[in-house]
From Swiss-Prot:
Gene Ontology cellular component list: bacterial-type flagellum basal body
BP-aspect Gene Ontology terms: bacterial-type flagellum assembly; bacterial-type flagellum-dependent cell motility
GO molecular function terms listed in the Swiss-Prot or TrEMBL record: cytoskeletal motor activity; structural molecule activity
InterPro entries: FliE
Predominant cellular place of this UniProt entry's protein: other
Cell location: Bacterial flagellum basal body
Family affiliation: Belongs to the FliE family.
Cysteines joined through disulfide linkages: none
Species assigned in the record: Bradyrhizobium diazoefficiens (strain JCM 10833 / BCRC 13528 / IAM 13628 / NBRC 14792 / USDA 110)
Keywords per UniProt: Bacterial flagellum
UniProt name for this protein: Flagellar hook-basal body complex protein FliE 2
Amino acid sequence: MLEAISSTAISAGQAASRATETQAIAPAAPTAIQSGGDVGFDSVMKQVTTDAIGTLKAGEAASISAMQGKESTRRVVEALMSAEQALQTAVAVRDKVVQAYQEVVRMSI
């Protein structure tokens, strides 16, 4: 005989599935910069770069999992949108750094 499927059993199954998905392809969480010391621009930029690379790798891993049929479309879209946002931020920072460098070069001594 078939057992009656309750909404509680379905919810528990969905929660377990989501937990597994989250653990499998979770983007790298931003790590806190250690306080108490002298925090320089270089250490902040290094941390931001590391976080962006982790996000891009998570998006790539989600795409590969989707091609293998292991990942839902919704999760892949979320990971890729997060990766796209990280890439756009990196490009914007690069553009600002180049612009600042060009301004310094143009300064008269």
